[in-house]
Design a protein with these regions (language model features):
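Membrane-interface loop-to-helix entry segments
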Residues: 59-73, 113-125
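Membrane-helix boundary connector in multi-pass membrane proteins
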Residues: 109-115, 131-144
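Membrane-interface helix caps and helix-loop-helix hairpins in membrane proteins
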Residues: 107-117, 164-168
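Final/C-terminal transmembrane alpha-helix of multipass membrane proteins
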Residues: 146-165
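N-terminal membrane topogenic signal
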Residues: 14-30
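Membrane-interfacial loop-to-transmembrane alpha-helix junctions, especially the N-terminal start
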Residues: 87-95
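Membrane-interface helix termini and inter-helical loops of multi-pass transporters
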Residues: 44-58, 166-167
């Protein structure tokens, strides 16, 4: 048996696509992407954010939408896989918790203008993402791998949030 780069046997990784699994995946993609776009639409950085002192590594505004679109797609793929394998388990509860924290951060930071409180939310999100990766690793490495870019981005966003708290 051959192993791929993240240690999954190719023979065990094959899956049979059914209409149910395709519809579930489509539902996860639709819900996560539409939720993310709605949160982004309702919490646009305005004059308050523009007036903040920001660190030198603050990315340009245009980068956030495409990065989050890709990350939300990865989150949806992982969510669909998790639902299929661990619908009532801890892994699915962690997935739901990370979605709640993910959707909570923008209104707290961008609309309520509470970067300190937002920092606690994003740090909790980061911990939950790491817990999700660890929890899924033994049973579904693909779901774990799908969360790695998400963890990297939220880690970066946490440093950005911390820097904004420190500089303001």
């Amino acid at each position: 048996m051959t192993l791929n780069c993240i240690g999954i046997r190719a023979e065990q990784n094959r899956r049979k696509w059914t209409m149910t699994s395709i519809m579930r995946l489509a539902a996860f993609i639709a819900c996560v992407l539409s939720g993310g776009f709605l949160i982004g639409y309702l919490n646009v950085p305005g004059s308050w954010y523009a007036g903040l002192n920001k660190p030198w590594f603050n990315p340009p505004k245009w980068i956030f939408a495409p990065v989050w679109a890709v990350i939300y797609l990865l989150i949806a793929l992982a969510g669909s896989r998790t639902w299929e394998r661990h619908r009532h388990g801890i892994a699915m509860r962690l997935w739901l918790l990370q979605m709640a924290l993910n959707f909570l951060w923008p209104p707290i930071f961008l609309s309520a203008h509470l970067p300190g409180f937002a920092l606690t939310i994003i740090l909790a999100l980061f911990v939950v993402i790491l817990a999700s990766i660890a929890r899924q690793w033994s049973s579904d490495r693909i779901s774990s791998a799908l969360f790695v870019p998400y963890a990297a981005w939220v880690g970066f966003a946490s440093m950005l949030n911390l820097s904004i708290v420190h500089l303001n």
